[in-house]
Amino acid sequence: MTDFVVVGGGVGGLVAARRLVLAGRSVTLLEASERLGGTVTSHTVGGIVLDAGAESFATRGGTVVALAKSLGLGDDVVEPLAEGAWLQPAEGAAFRLPENSLLGIPSWPLASDVIAAIGFRSAFRAYVESLIPAPYGAKSVTLGELVRRRMGSDVVDRLVNPIVRGVHSVDADELELDAAAPGLRKALLRVGYLAGAVADLRQTSARAGSAVAGIRGGVHRLVDNLGSDLSRFGVDVRLGVSAASVEADSVTTADGERIDGTVIVAAPGLLGGGTAPGRRVVLATLVVDEPRLDAAPRGTGVLVADGAPGIRARALTHATAKWRWLAEAAEGKHVLRLSYDADAADDVDLAEIARADASALLGVPLDPSSTVDFARVAWYRPGRERYTPNGMLVVGETIAGTGIASIVAQSEALAGSLVDDSNG
Ligand SMILES: Cc1cc2nc3c(=O)[nH]c(=O)nc-3n(C[C@H](O)[C@H](O)[C@H](O)COP(=O)(O)OP(=O)(O)OC[C@H]3O[C@@H](n4cnc5c(N)ncnc54)[C@H](O)[C@@H]3O)c2cc1C
């Protein structure tokens, strides 16, 4: 009998297991695959070790930075280079994303970069909400609903949606407001209008430094070090063991073994409790040798609006223009990460498609001979649980939403409450 059985060794499960073992509890962790880390992992492309999934994390709340410090990675937390990202709209040329914005919501709708992006009429429509400060829209459930009500559809469709799809692979109308932009609802209630709420939140995060950060050498180092800590602290980590069914106080593995203990589910999709449909995402990584990219023609990358003609990618990250450590490791070559919805990446020569998309998005024709290496990684992300069966403890993306920052915070909080409760 173990005190806790954690099912799933992604970042959610690893953080929970570490918190529990550090509080003196016995922990068994079951991981279906042969490695820890889940969606946070690495691969080697063109001789460079790169993140094959998540490559950065939100700094809000300071939770991930605190975790990195406790894992001995404090000196390796790095901010991205300040080049900014671009947007490829459905029609017309790419433009630099408005500087003072949050998930595409402008803090000053009449700024010249907002007008350049959506036109004066739509920018003025967005500005008007500041003339009528009121909590109107604050009860909105989704991010899209709130922004549409306050600032109009053009801000949602042309600025917010391309960004939200790039990060979360869903539309702003499908994304819960509090998960997408923690603190925005409260700021709106306090300030009275959305642009002001965005300015308020931006000011807070500016005081705290960049909104996102990475780890020198790659974010996968977080899960590598979490895994090492679990071994060091005596967690019984079982790789290649899949949970077939879970109860609140026991797990039955696919091999029929029953393991008793308080169960924490950290495996998205395992409970299947009224989930939204899952989605497949494909990440294409190109390492290219093309000196014309040294000037970072589209800053740190390009988000792609739905319907951009001839482009299948959802987003492109110019990773060597985003991370100094990576530019140094690449020794003059460039690393481009393009994300695709699976249906756009199935049954095609993805290396060729990615090269064509990168050429169009970066405005620099990439000759086939410039490609040093290419890698394709397919991910399946189960839908978010709408509810969890009574009494089940759940951590990770299933319940915290997409992103390392939300997951680490939720997992730490839940595991902490369990040991605090039983201590009291
Ligand atoms: C391409 C891509 C890029 C991303 N980029 C970023 C980014 O830059 N920044 C960011 O913050 N987030 C990013 N994300 C999202 C982030 O990686 C995830 O939200 C997070 O890693 C999910 O962690 P998790 O522990 O909840 O789940 P997972 O990482 O999915 O881990 C769950 C684990 O459970 C295991 N498992 C499943 N079923 C069972 C079972 N029955 N029994 C035992 N084990 C089981 C799985 O094998 C897996 O190891 C990205 C995601 C993708 C796909």
Please annotate each region the language model reported:
Residues 123-244:
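Active-site/ligand-binding neighborhood in enzyme catalytic cores
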Residues 21-45:
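Glycine-rich FAD pyrophosphate-binding loop
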Residues 8, 79-81, 237-241, 247, ...:
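Short loop/edge segments at beta-strand edges and connector loops
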Residues 2-29:
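N-terminal Rossmann-like FAD-binding beta1-loop-alpha1 element of flavoenzymes
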Residues 46-134:
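Dinucleotide-binding Rossmann-like beta1-alpha1 core, especially the glycine-rich loop
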Residues 42, 98-101, 315-424:
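Conserved flavin/dinucleotide-binding core of flavoenzymes
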Residues 89, 241-348, 361:
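Mid-domain catalytic core of redox enzymes
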